[in-house]
Amino acid sequence: MQTCSGKGIKMAFLDVQSSSTPQSLPLLLFSHREGGGRGAGDPGAPAVVPAPVSAPRPASSPARSESRSPPLTLISRHITCCSCESPGDVLLSGRGGGGGGGGGARTGGGEGEDRRPRPDFSRVTAVAIPGWMEVESPPHPPPQPQVCPTPSQGAPGHGRAGLPEGKGPGGRDWLRSQSSRCSRATLFGHRAPSPAAPRRGRLPAPGFPSLHSAVSLF
């Protein structure tokens, strides 16, 4: 948990979607007001107030400076309250409204703010001031292990020490070649070839006779 210093308005940019229009809105600016409890059981909790967001206008309409607050649904909830010094889910879904009655909410337009729509609305992507809010990304799923041939595969009844010699299926040379191909396939993101699949060198080229038919011509 990061230690936050300073008091006042603390902001974070969050990804949102509008429930009234299919077009995704840009970034919603949240202002963090200290004091003024949100719930009855926690009078000291800071209030999270959504600031007005400039609605996307059609290309044909003239530019206007006014802004309205469409219904907003927060997608990202992986964030930690930093001003109250305790981890918790302080983001609330609701209707964006005019600053909570003059509580110090500020609209967007500051330096470094990106107003372009973002294609991904699954997590918090930007923070206004680093160190004031700690962003927690969702945990990534563990990578699936690559299934590579082992000495027990393809050679039933043979242990690691009793492998049959030779280049046939189950032999040491065969397992070594399969393991090397498996590692190369894992490196390039492809699945390893199945042992039962024919080798590429044995396939005749399209439009040409096979080796046996070519030999039989002479």
From Swiss-Prot:
Superkingdom, natural source: Eukaryota
Region feature (Disordered): 30-71, 93-120, 133-209
Biased segments, Low complexity type: 43-71, 191-209
Regions of compositional bias (Gly residues) in chain numbering: 94-110, 156-171
Ranges of compositional bias, category Pro residues: 138-148
Protein name: Putative uncharacterized protein FLJ45840
Naturally occurring in which organism (per UniProt): Homo sapiens (Human)
